[in-house]
Amino acid sequence: SDAEVMRFCQAFMTELYRHIGPDTDVPAGDIGTGAREIGYMFGQYKKIMNEYTGVLTGKSLSYGGSLARKEATGYGLCYFTNELLREHGMSFDGMTTVISGSGNVAIYACEKAQTLGAKVVALSDSNGYIYDRDGIKLDVVKQIKEVERGRISEYAKRVPGSVYTEGCSGIWSIKCDIALPCATQNEIC
């Protein structure tokens, strides 16, 4: 329940607050942790420390969070990659791109890569990956992942010509010009 999540977050911060701070370590939300949980932890930190400081990222706007926080990591990855490509006389434009993951980083990396002209053909989750040779329809992915909180396999049921494959590692065998690992740590061995 919401109350249990709140109590857990508050208890966690009661132990964590000594080890973090705006000049020490600034934790952020991660898989399964969003603005709600960060808000609970930030509220507890404020209560304990009597400070309203930048000690956690991923807060809601009402707690001083950033407007584009949700998009920041995925967009940043693409801006950084685009600069690397530019140094070598290339860009995302026309590049076939594979992206692992389908959370915030992957979804917004996909969005920005497409905006920069890439053709993103694959995304994954912890169960498998989708391949769409015509290019991922991001509106469908956002509906499944952000609204319905569903699995990426749903995409293949809704988009004709796309394919879902169980298991995640196969995504790296898809022929592409650019591969962006956005799922979790240690995914490329």
Model-inferred region functions:
Residues I38, A106, E187-C189:
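Short, well-ordered alpha-helical microsegments
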Residues T33, V105, Q185:
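Glycine-/small-residue-rich active-site loops that bind phosphorylated ligands and cofactors
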Residues E15-T24, Y45-Y52, N127-I130, V147-S162, ...:
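Short secondary-structure junctions and interdomain/linker hinges
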Residues S1-D93:
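Glycine/serine-rich phosphate-binding loop and adjoining beta1-alpha1 elements at the start
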Residues T165-C189:
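Long hydrophobic segments that form regular secondary structure
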Residues T57, G65-G170:
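Glycine-rich phosphate/diphosphate-binding loop of Rossmann-like nucleotide-binding domains
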Residues P27, V98, I178-P181:
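Short catalytic-loop micro-motif centered on adjacent basic/acidic residues
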